[in-house]
Curated annotation (Swiss-Prot):
Comp. bias intervals (Basic residues): 474-486
Topological domain ranges for the Extracellular compartment: 146-150, 205-210, 268-346, 364-376, 763-771, 823-831, 889-915, 929-940, 1213-1224, 1279-1287, 1343-1394, 1406-1431, 1535-1545, 1599-1607, 1664-1686, 1700-1733
Ranges of compositional bias, category Acidic residues: 1137-1148
Name the UniProt record assigns to this protein: Sodium channel protein type 9 subunit alpha
Lineage: Eukaryota, Metazoa, Chordata, Craniata, Vertebrata
Gene designation: SCN9A
Any one Gene Ontology BP term: inflammatory response
Length: 1988
């Protein structure tokens, strides 16, 4: 805000012809100046338009109201930037700014022509945009009609007319395209233009396919974006993120192309293999049959089809591929599956298949088809693609979108902060001016009245003054006083003003961001503000007038859950500390009102930043009251004649009328100026001063009123009717009720009721008995009654005014009202949905459950921020839905027989808008491939592919990832750890604490009673007793020191269980904010804080609160240790107590004690004397065992045994019975393993002792697993092996591999990270379950018992409802026929448990369509379903997917990533303690240290070799090779299945040419580079590829002849793809992304190992439980749990949650007729093929949660983390490449790699580098100033140069020195040769020596000259005077010479940098070397000087 415009109408000036002439004059002036100024640098900041006055924004507050005659009229531009540009502005009633070009529109209409003026008036009118908006919406509604009636044609014309009118108005008002702000200069208008042009084209010109052109009308929907302001920014963010995605997109396309080529080579033509019938009729051949096949029936006649499948069964020729059933053979014939669209036959289809794999859509189908056709070994291909392609690339897209959003967000926050600051400054300036003006007015009035009374003897001052002060101002003042009194008298104690203070306009982002404070300016100003001995409390000003304190700044600066009142209670005026937290949060302290505990109204007001004057000058003056007044450089008022109005003394302290505000004084100035008499004598000036005061007052009033939430009458009404204080009795009654209702126990009771009510609702199921139904109904009545009573009582206790100010209460009242309404309307048909509202009660739990609260907040915040994004998404969905309907609707209708046998529309079609919308929504969910096949079949491939890909990329990848990015950004680690609890939420904790205390008290009394009764002396140690005393003390005050001192005295942490709550939660009164450090800065300050009586403060004390300086040592131990591990927070001994003891076992070779101290103390027999006798022998045995166990070989042996025993489990598959020998070997092996593990356990017991063994979690794991083996061993020996329990125990052996966890470091790290994350994962899991519970109960209400249907069991089809309307009819049919069945869906909503399972299938989008179809077809309980009868049930699923799936599942990602980062912080050691600055240096040095100068490959001496060398090392050669690689790639893409012989030959020869070319390259390089060729990695890679290509070419025939496996041949052909990978070398962006992947690899390998372990265990479980289930759905002859390999194949598929519904379905068959419990399996003793539903559900759900949600998300977390690191690396000022470049240039200057270059070459070297290291010539002075060390021969070491150059880039820094020594040690180790050299001098010293030498020489010359002159002068003595002059002149000339040489010198000495120290030389040597060096230097100087 450079200029504060004068408030009121002065700012606005009509735009007239004079204005235009003035502008033209300014332009002419500017042009005349321009030629002179052209030389100015472009870097200088050009003036920019003001962001507040941009077109389209609201006019800033400060300009006040627009004078009546100026609305919608052309005005002069307010923005100074446009002063010399031909523009003018127009303001409409809503104060929106419109900017127009002042040149004639269309070359005809000047700004003053009536037509243009009318157009402008229409354009700026708010109704005009409303009209357009309504037109667009109506038009959209018409667009959704699929068969519009004829009359809509006319409506269409109307729309076109309106749009044309709109464009005409715009063109007339703005001009067409010449000049700024004209019609076509706004890109959004291009859209309108195109739409209108197309509308007319389609009308008047016949363009053929009209429907395609009509789809262009859809773009009109995009116009909504240009009309709604917030949307433009989101679209901006989207476009930004798409730009940022370019690199990732290129990488994705590149990777997919490579994978597609691999797929093409491996699986070309494989998917055409089918099972063909053997028995052909007479003389039929395959060819003849293929020619006759036409319809589906013909195909089914000859090929083998599975029931319900559309495609023939695939098979393969290799042993591990799918086999055909008997009577069929495998042939390659016919088309590919899925209408022929799924194949690897050409590059394009292979690319589509890979894209589908990457997006993981229905990929299990592709996986199964491919493995069936090619063989199971190719699973490896899928593993690589899923892990690299899918997980990595998709998440990179997420990472990029998230970063783009984050950057955009940061920018917005910064801008908003700036605005708030500017606004605040303006307000403060206005206030100050207002005060000054008022003071002047008062003084003037007083002066007038005194003069009058002198003259007339009468006092008429009052009337005179009232004339002067305007009436409105007076009214305002009165109103203000009234309001203040009213406000302060009303019950503000509850902090309700907080509710009023948030201004309506603030949005959540701003609110979140502002408490960050405006760091930079503030710190500086606060230092200036508070004088040393003065409390900041006294910085007062009108800023804190009472009126302001209740409603404040535009955006309230809310500190995190803390209010100032509590802070200022302990700040006493003299010594309060201005804590760092406050300066960080940026609020000024405010005096606290004594009658309020929590003065939240002040807390709101005070969060405004300090006033920063516009001109940057701030003077603070302390007046006689010690009040700091801020005097701003230009705050004084300007008078018309340019005089400053001085400040005024106001004699009496002006306090507000209201008594309660007497602490908040107005600013008084005691040291001010008096008004000059002549000034007051001037009546004009006086009048001016007073009116000025009133104007200012009005402006400030208006500003503040504009920020009120509600109009004033509302407050009057509220006070009258919503506060009930009728009579004293009523008030007493009210207090009683208040006391009861607000009691923590009542809260607890209500919470228990909520839980019970939820349970009651969750108990509904189908079928239910009548009694049960009645119980539930009565329960509902009771709970409704309880909640209604609670609401009524609270209303009485709090008054409606108070009650409705609390969010939770509003929520409660809504739910209670709805429940009551539902009770009355229970019997009305169709209103059963109201029952679902009861479910919202579950959310009341959030009040007392912080995580749920946080989740709701996160969703709330996101929805706030997502509002605009959701709108954009909705617009996109709408547009694509309409496009789909317009383009493909007809085709679906006409060609429906192609995709459906009975020629009816399928469920997913685009014939009408709703179905079209559903398809687009399904694509957004990531399911696009199946609907796309249908679309391609009916409407042609090209259009469908384009539309689907656009929806997929725009909708799914970009917008949905932006959703996720928003979610992740609302997750900051604070949210999870320090959940801000609302004080009321603690009521529950208080209640629980009371109960605990009661129980403890009862226990203690009982214990004491028993002890007394048995008259034993209690053996409770003193410490324990003291700790208990401490715990039960009921003192109300505790000082922050005494606690720590008591803790030191009593060692109360010894009693671990007592204080387990220590450090768990923060007491609400003790500290209001966890980051506050209010006493830490002042150790002597002791603060006493009231604590609620009877509440123990120990359990609420936070560890951080103890860390005040006085007890820092104790607290350090406490804090450091508590963060180290999750499990051991309590047993932290105090310093000096257990430290040594703990450290011992680490170092000693001796075992620890066997038993715990408690055992030894109780049972003296455990005490053994180890000095003598048996004890000594025992001790020696223990020591021997200890040595054995600790030996590394022992550990390796055990690991081997674990691996072998785990491996043995993998053999126990379905075929074990047939392999007798293996079975016997395994049985013996199992016994041996068991014995070995028992032995290991015993050894460890003896070696470590029970205490150590059983306090280690990993040992417990070992112990339990060994127990299982032991029990099964004993059972087998006793012959009980067939018992049920023993069998189930045997399956637990699958856990054996878990023992490997603790043995592998990598996996242990991951597991520890996971274990650390478990609490928060469980928390989120619970919250998700609660969230889903609501949907599950709703599902039960909607669908329970409605999924039954009557089916024909022969083909599984459903009888039409017209034939079989209900259950009874179906049963009648069943009696007649065997093939009829009344069957329920396996996964349904019959109870809450099954509801959860159904929701999980919907949320993972697996098997969800079947559930959805059943729901949409459902009619009623026991009724036969009808096709799409309840069509709008789709909406239930859409809503669930948005909230249940997008939000909650992504929340998991959020939690895991968050946790991951927190853990990293905990373990991250050094990184956290480095500043950003240090990190920069550290990273640069890290890179720098890893490099060293290499000798360039020498150019060979031989002439021919030399020429080849020049050719090969030329950049053009590299580029041409890259081009060849690309061409090679293209030729490989051309290859396809079934190509002609001719084409095959052409491609073969092309390939031969490429092989020759690449071989040629290889040979040329070998000739020229000789043995150096193999020193470069890429060359080796090329060499290998060339060799394999040649071998492959020659061996192709051999392989085909002898080894008939085409697979091997194919794999060899893949080698050619290796050449493509060389492209990566060239692209920097891609390299960054791959660098991120390389950085992730170690971590990803660990996670992969863990995933493999989980899969291994689950595979063994699966084999033992589900090996024999019936083969249907997803389980068949290849994909099953019969063998270990098959189980792994299935589990890999479910890792991405793909197809788990199909694998679960057969396991849910539990009884006939679904399965046969008596079925015999040949070769096995197992009977039946039924599954176990509960085990199956647990198995799959747990596996999905562990693998899909946890492990896979950790994978994502690692990638996101490393991506941000990699991008940081690439944006750092110095990257790897810069150092590489340095060394590349170095090689040219130092061909022998001596690591030195001569000083003379340095200048050229510095100029030869690329930026940022480049130092362009002239660079001599800069280089000398670097003070580089030189060795003999004036040579400088490369690292010294690099170090100095690096420092120059990164900037001088104090932290540099601390790191320097470390760095150099690293360089020394990397470059040993550096150690040996000793610098003699430095460049700076050398220069100084040179300069000294020239100075000495010149002095000597001057001296000689003088001598000569003297001699001459003595001869010519007569002309002495003249000679003297001459001499002086000469002297001066010499002095000048001398001075001229000095700038170099001063310039050189100005650098104070010292040369680097070389720490690897040991200190004494170093000192000696320093000494030698100085001596040498001195000698050198002496000798030089003597020479001279």
């Amino acid at each position: 805000m450079a200029m504060l415009p004068p408030p009121g109408p002065q700012s606005f000036v009509h735009f007239t012809k004079q204005s235009l002439a003035l502008i033209e004059q300014r332009i002419a002036e500017r042009k005349s100046k321009e030629p002179k100024e052209e030389k100015k640098d472009d870097d200088e900041e050009a003036p920019k338009p003001s962001s507040d006055l941009e077109a389209g924004k609201q006019l800033p507050f400060i300009y006040g109201d627009i004078p009546p005659g100026m609305v919608s009229e052309p005005l002069e531009d307010l923005d100074p930037y446009y002063a010399d540009k031909k523009t003018f502005i127009v303001l409409n009633k809503g104060k929106t700014i419109f900017r127009f070009n002042a040149t004639p529109a269309l070359y005809m209409l000047s700004p003053f022509s009536p037509l243009r003026r009318i157009s402008i008036k229409i354009l700026v009118h708010s109704l005009f945009s409303m009209l357009i908006m309504c037109t667009i919406l109506t038009n959209c509604i018409f667009m959704t009609m699929n068969n519009p009636p004829d009359w809509t044609k006319n409506v269409e014309y109307t729309f076109t007319g309106i749009y044309t009118f709109e464009s005409l108005v715009k063109i007339l008002a703005r001009g067409f395209c010449v000049g700024e702000f004209t019609f076509l200069r706004d890109p959004w208008n291009w859209l309108d233009f195109v739409v209108i042009v197309f509308a007319y084209l389609t009308e008047f010109v016949n363009l053929g396919n009209v429907s395609a052109l009509r789809t262009f009308r859809v773009l009109r929907a995009l116009k909504t974006i240009s009309v709604i302001p917030g949307l433009k920014t989101i679209v901006g963010a989207l476009i930004q993120s798409v730009k940022k995605l370019s690199d990732v997109m290129i990488l994705t396309v590149f990777c997919l192309s490579v994978f597609a080529l691999i797929g093409l080579q491996l699986f070309m033509g494989n998917l055409k293999h089918k099972c063909f019938r053997n028995s052909l009729e007479n003389n039929e051949t395959l060819e003849s049959i293929m020619n006759t096949l036409e319809s589906e029936e013909d195909f089914r006649k000859y090929f083998y089809y599975l029931e319900g499948s559309k495609d023939a069964l695939l098979c393969g020729f290799s042993t591990d591929s799918g086999q055909c059933p008997e009577g069929y053979t495998c042939v390659k014939i016919g088309r590919n599956p899925d209408y022929g669209y799924t194949s690897f036959d050409t590059f394009s289809w292979a690319f589509l298949a890979l894209f589908r794999l990457m997006t993981q859509d229905y990929w299990e189908n592709l996986y199964q088809q491919t493995l069936r056709a090619a063989g199971k070994t190719y699973m490896i291909f899928f593993v690589v693609v899923i892990f690299l392609g899918s997980f990595y690339l998709i998440n990179l897209i997420l990472a990029v979108v998230a970063m783009a959003y984050e950057e955009q967000n940061q920018a917005n926050i910064e801008e908003a902060k700036q605005k708030e600051l500017e606004f605040q400054q303006m307000l403060d300036r206005l206030k100050k001016e207002q005060e000054e003006a008022e003071a002047i007015a008062a003084a003037a009035a007083e002066y007038t009245s005194i003069r009058r009374s002198r003259i007339m003897g009468l006092s008429e001052s009052s009337s005179e003054t009232s004339k002067l002060s305007s009436k409105s101002a007076k009214e305002r003042r009165n109103r203000r006083k009234k309001k203040n009194q009213k406000k302060l008298s009303s019950g503000e104690e509850k902090g309700d003003a907080e509710k009023l203070s948030k201004s309506e306009s603030e949005d959540s982002i701003r609110r979140k961001s502002f408490h960050l404070g405006v760091e930079g300016h503030r710190r500086a100003h606060e230092k200036r503000l508070s004088t040393p001995n003065q409390s900041p409390l006294s910085i007062r000003g009108s800023l804190f007038s009472a009126r302001r304190s209740s409603r404040t700044s535009l955006f309230s600066f809310k500190g995190r859950g803390r209010d100032i009142g509590s802070e200022t209670e302990f700040a006493d005026d003299e010594h309060s500390i201005f804590g760092d937290n406050e300066s960080r949060r940026g609020s000024l302290f405010v005096p606290h009102r004594p009658q309020e505990r929590r003065s939240s109204n002040i807390s709101q007001a005070s969060r405004s930043p300090p006033m920063l004057p516009v001109n940057g000058k701030m003077h603070s003056a302390v007046d006689c009251n010690g009040v700091v007044s801020l005097v701003d450089g230009r705050s004084a008022l300007m008078l018309p004649n340019g005089q400053l109005l001085p400040e005024v003394i106001i004699d009496k302290a002006t306090s507000d009328d209201s008594g309660t505000t007497n602490q908040i004084h107005k600013k008084r100035r005691c040291s001010s100026y008096l008004l000059s008499e002549d000034m007051l004598n001037d009546p004009n000036l006086r009048q001016r001063a007073m009116s000025r005061a009133s104007i200012l007052t009005n402006t400030v009033e208006e500003l503040e009123e504009s920020r009120q939430k509600c109009p004033p009458w509302w407050y009057r009404f509220a006070h009258k009717f919503l506060i009930w204080n009728c009579s004293p009795y009523w008030i007493k009654f009210k207090k009683c009720i208040y006391f009861i209702v607000m009691d923590p126990f009542v809260d607890l009771a209500i919470t228990i009721c909520i839980v019970l009510n939820t349970l009651f609702m969750a108990m509904e199921h189908h079928p239910m008995t009548e009694e049960f139904k009645n119980v539930l109904a009565i329960g509902n009545l009771v709970f409704t009654g309880i909640f209604a009573a609670e609401m009524v009582l609270k209303l009485i206790a709090m008054d409606p005014y108070e009650y409705f100010q609390v969010g939770w209460n509003i929520f409660d009242s809504l739910i209670v009202t709805l429940s009551l309404v539902e009770l009355f309307l229970a019997d009305v048909e169709g209103l059963s949905v109201l029952r679902s509202f009861r479910l919202l009660r579950v959310f009341k739990l959030a009040k007392s459950w912080p995580t749920l609260n946080m989740l709701i907040k996160i969703i709330g915040n996101s929805v706030g921020a997502l509002g605009n994004l959701t709108l954009v998404l909705a617009i996109i969905v709408f547009i694509f839905a309409v496009v789909g309907m317009q383009l493909f609707g007809k085709s679906y209708k006409e060609c429906v027989c192609k995709i459906n046998d009975d020629c009816t529309l399928p469920r997913w079609h685009m014939n009408d808008f709703f179905h079209s919308f559903l398809i687009v929504f399904r694509v957004l969910c990531g399911e696009w491939i199946e609907t796309m096949w249908d679309c391609m079949e009916v409407a042609g491939q090209a259009m469908c592919l384009i539309v689907y890909m656009m929806v997929m990329v725009i909708g799914n990848l970009v917008v949905l990832n932006l959703f996720l990015a928003l979610l992740l950004s609302s997750f900051s680690s604070d949210n999870l750890t320090a959940i801000e609890e609302d004080p009321d939420a603690n009521n529950l904790q208080i209640a629980v604490t009371r109960i605990k205390k009661g129980i403890n008290y009862v226990k203690q009394t009982l214990r004491e009673f028993i002890l007394k009764a048995f008259s034993k002396k209690p053996k409770i140690s003193r410490e324990i007793r003291q700790a208990e005393d401490l715990n039960t003390k009921k003192e109300n005050y505790i000082s922050n020191h005494t606690l720590a001192e008591m803790s030191k005295g009593h060692n109360f942490l010894k009693e671990k269980d007592k204080i387990s709550g220590f450090g768990s939660s923060v007491d609400k009164h003790l500290m209001e904010d966890s980051d506050g450090q209010s006493f830490i800065h002042n150790p002597s300050l002791t603060v006493t804080v009231p604590i609620a009586p009877g509440e123990s403060d120990l359990e609420n004390m936070n560890a951080e609160e103890l860390s005040s300086d006085s007890d820092s040592e104790y607290s350090k131990v406490r804090l450091n240790r508590s963060s180290s591990s999750e499990c051991s927070t309590v047993d932290n001994p105090l310093p000096g107590e257990g430290e040594e003891a703990e450290a011992e076992p680490m170092n000693s070779d001796e075992p620890e004690a066997c038993f715990t101290d408690g055992c030894v103390w109780r049972f003296s027999c455990c005490q053994v004397n180890i000095e003598s006798g048996k004890g000594k022998i025992w001790w020696n045995i223990r020591k021997t065992c200890y040595k054995i166990v600790e030996h590394s070989w022992f550990e390796s042996f055990i690991v081997l045994m674990i691996l072998l025993s785990s491996g043995a489990l993998a053999f126990e598959d379905i075929y074990i019975e047939r392999k007798k020998t293996i079975k016997i070997i395994l049985e013996y092996a199992d016994k041996i393993f068991t014995y070995i593990f028992i032995l290991e356990m015993l050894l460890k017991w003896i070696a470590y002792g029970y205490k150590t063994y059983f306090t280690n979690a990993w040992c417990w794991l070992d112990f339990l697993i060994v127990d299982v083996s032991l029990v099964t061993l004993v059972a087998n020996t006793l012959g009980y092996s067939d018992l049920g329990p023993i069998k189930s125990l045997r399956t637990l052996r699958a856990l054996r591999p878990l023992r490997a966890l603790s043995r592998f470091e990598g996996m242990r790290v991951v597991v520890n990270a996971l274990i650390g994350a478990i609490p928060s994962i469980m928390n989120v899991l619970l919250v998700c379950l609660i969230f889903w519970l609501i949907f599950s109960i709703m599902g039960v209400n909607l669908f329970a018992g409605k999924f039954y249907e009557c089916i024909n069991t022969t083909d599984g089809s459903r009888f039409p409802a017209s034939q079989v309307p209900n259950r009874s009819e179906c049963f009648a049919l069943m009696n007649v026929s065997q093939n009829v069945r009344w069957k329920n869906l396996k996964v349904n909503f019959d109870n809450v448990g099954l509801g959860y399972l159904s929701l999980l299938q919907v949320a993972t989008f697996k098997g969800w369509t079947i559930i959805m179809y059943a729901a949409v077809d459902s009619v009623n309980v026991d009724k036969q379903p009808k096709y799409e009868y309840s069509l709008y049930m789709y909406i239930y699923f859409v809503v669930f997917i948005i909230f249940g799936s997008f939000f909650t599942l992504n929340l998991f990602i959020g939690v895991i990533i968050d946790n991951f980062n927190q853990q990293k912080k905990k373990l991250g050691g050094q990184d956290i303690f480095m500043t950003e600055e240090q990190k920069k240096y550290y990273n640069a040095m890290k890179k720098l240290g890893s490099k060293k100068p290499q000798k360039p490959i020498p150019r060979p001496g031989n002439k021919i070799q030399g020429c080849i060398f020049d050719l090969v090392t030329n950049q053009a050669f590299d580029i041409s090779i890259m081009v060849l690689i690309c061409l090679n790639m293209v030729t490989m893409m051309v290859e396809k299945e079934g190509q002609s012989q001719h084409m095959t030959e052409v491609l073969y020869w092309i390939n031969v040419v490429f092989i020759i070319l690449f071989t040629g390259e290889c040979v040329l390089k070998l000739i020229s580079l000789r043995h150096y060729y193999f020193t470069v990695g890429w060359n080796i890679f090329d060499f290998v590829v060339v060799i394999i290509s040649i071998v492959g070419m020659f061996l192709a025939d051999l392989i085909e002849t002898y080894f008939v496996s085409p697979t091997l041949f194919r794999v060899i052909r893949l080698a050619r793809i290796g050449r493509i990978l060389r492209l990566v070398k060239g692209a920097k962006g891609i390299r960054t992304l791959l660098f991120a992947l390389m950085m992730s690899l170690p971590a990803l390998f660990n996670i992969g190992l863990l995933l493999f372990l989980v899969m291994f265990i689950y595979a063994i479980f699966g084999m033992s439980n589900f090996a024999y289930v019936k083969k249907e759905d997803g389980i068949n002859d290849m994909f099953n749990f019969e063998t270990f390999g098959n189980s792994m194949i299935c589990l890999f598929q479910i890792t991405t949650s793909a197809g788990w519904d199909g694998l679960l379905a057969p396991i849910l068959n539990s009884k006939p007729p679904d399965c046969d419990p008596k079925k015999v399996h040949p070769g096995s003793s197992v009977e039946g093929d039924c599954g176990n539903p509960s085990v199956g559900i647990f198995y799959f759900v747990s596996y999905i949660i562990i693998s899909f949600l946890v492990v896979v998300n950790m994978y994502i977390a690692v990638i996101l983390e490393n991506f941000s690191v990699a991008t940081e690396e690439s944006t750092e000022p110095l990257s790897e490449d810069d150092f590489e470049m340095f060394y590349e240039v170095w090689e040219k200057f130092d061909p022998d790699a001596t690591q030195f270059i001569e000083f003379s070459k340095l200048s050229d070297f510095a100029a030869a580098l690329d930026p940022p290291l480049l130092i362009a010539k002239p660079n001599k002075v800069q280089l000398i100033a670097m003070d580089l060390p030189m060795v003999s021969g004036d040579r400088i070491h490369c690292l010294d140069i690099l170090f100095a150059f690096t420092k120059r880039v990164l900037g001088e820094s104090g932290e540099m020195d601390s790191l320097r020594s470390q760095m150099e040690e690293r360089f020394m180790s990397a470059n040993p040769s550096k150690v040996s050299y000793e610098p003699i001098t430095t460049t700076l010293k050398r220069k100084q020596e040179d300069v000294s030498a020239t100075v000495i020489q010149r002095a000597y010359r001057r001296y000689r000259l003088r001598q000569n002159v003297k001699n001459i002068s003595s001869i010519y003595i007569k002309d002495g005077d003249r000679d003297d002059d001459l001499l002086n002149k000469k002297d001066m000339a010499f002095d000048n010479v001398n001075e001229n040489s000095s700038p170099e010198k001063t310039d050189a000495t100005s650098s104070t940098t010292s040369p680097p120290s070389y720490d690897s030389v040991t200190k004494p040597d170093k000192e000696k070397y320093e000494q030698d060096r100085t001596e040498k230097e001195d000698k050198g100087k002496d000798s030089k000087e003597s020479k001279k």
